[in-house]
Amino acid sequence: MTSFRLALIQLQISSIKSDNVTRACSFIREAATQGAKIVSLPECFNSPYGAKYFPEYAEKIPGESTQKLSEVAKECSIYLIGGSIPEEDAGKLYNTCAVFGPDGTLLAKYRKIHLFDIDVPGKITFQESKTLSPGDSFSTFDTPYCRVGLGICYDMRFAELAQIYAQRGCQLLVYPGAFNLTTGPAHWELLQRSRAVDNQVYVATASPARDDKASYVAWGHSTVVNPWGEVLAKAGTEEAIVYSDIDLKKLAEIRQQIPVFRQKRSDLYAVEMKKP
């Protein structure tokens, strides 16, 4: 298959976990009725985003929230990228994305590698590392359409992760993410377009909808970018579903027209994976 429909769910997050999960499943069903074959939820889709919330909302995987995702993926016969949730495992907390196949099987689990620790004086200070531990592995999964590579939010700033995924044959990179009102307007779209052009892949980001009353205000603007760096679809700040038809023939054409993979000077430099 050379094309398929991708859907990104820009969900309004509340403080009530069960409501978030129920509403996420409702939007997933709606996306499936519109022909979406791969659907992504946003970062921290079942929880407010913030260090103080992670311990309270954390679950095992499998657990309550991911069981619902497994069920709805099977019901709708889709590939479901479950945004992320705070995961508890062996006394540690992680920011984790679980992926489910059309039969409800857990296909992949990705723990955010690069924790969001920043300090922009007078604007925003945040330290995920106060409560979360970093993941230590890459994660891809295969579909009948293409291979998909996973990252979460801050991971998008690290070009090496995207390069390794491209080397491993990924044609679509999906980053559930929640940039903020400082970094969002400056870097959200720029980073997506950069990763797409650098690696000649499709890049998709799924953000929570903006809630100006939240302790952490998400930028929104869930986006799909093609390998030419063009924005194919983009949400505003409100709750929405973003749809984009992914054309893999277009990707192949771009790679043929500008064959950077064949032109890389591997005799001079390399980006390599040190741990599978």
Curated annotation (Swiss-Prot):
One of its GO terms (cellular component) is cytosol. It is found in: Cytoplasm. InterPro entries: C-N_Hydrolase, C-N_Hydrolase_sf, Nit1/2_C-N_Hydrolase. Residues 4-248 form the CN hydrolase domain. Keywords: Acetylation, Cytoplasm, Hydrolase, Phosphoprotein. Its EC number is 3.5.1.3. It comes from the Eukaryota. GO terms for molecular function: 2-oxoglutaramate amidase activity; omega-amidase activity. It catalyses: a monoamide of a dicarboxylate + H2O = a dicarboxylate + NH4(+); 2-oxoglutaramate + H2O = 2-oxoglutarate + NH4(+); 2-oxosuccinamate + H2O = oxaloacetate + NH4(+). The modification Phosphoserine is found at residue 26. The modification N6-acetyllysine is found at residue 68. It holds the Pfam family CN_hydrolase. Coiled coil: none annotated. The modification N6-succinyllysine is found at residues 68, 123, 130. GO terms for biological process: asparagine metabolic process; glutamine metabolic process; oxaloacetate metabolic process. Detected in fetal brain (at protein level). Ubiquitous. Detected in heart, brain, placenta, lung, liver, skeletal muscle, kidney, pancreas, prostate, spleen, thymus, prostate, testis, ovary, small intestine and colon. Has omega-amidase activity. The role of omega-amidase is to remove potentially toxic intermediates by converting 2-oxoglutaramate and 2-oxosuccinamate to biologically useful 2-oxoglutarate and oxaloacetate, respectively. Belongs to the carbon-nitrogen hydrolase superfamily. NIT1/NIT2 family. PANTHER family: NITRILASE-RELATED (PTHR23088), OMEGA-AMIDASE NIT2 (PTHR23088:SF30). Homodimer. This is Omega-amidase NIT2. It comes from Homo sapiens (Human). The gene is NIT2.
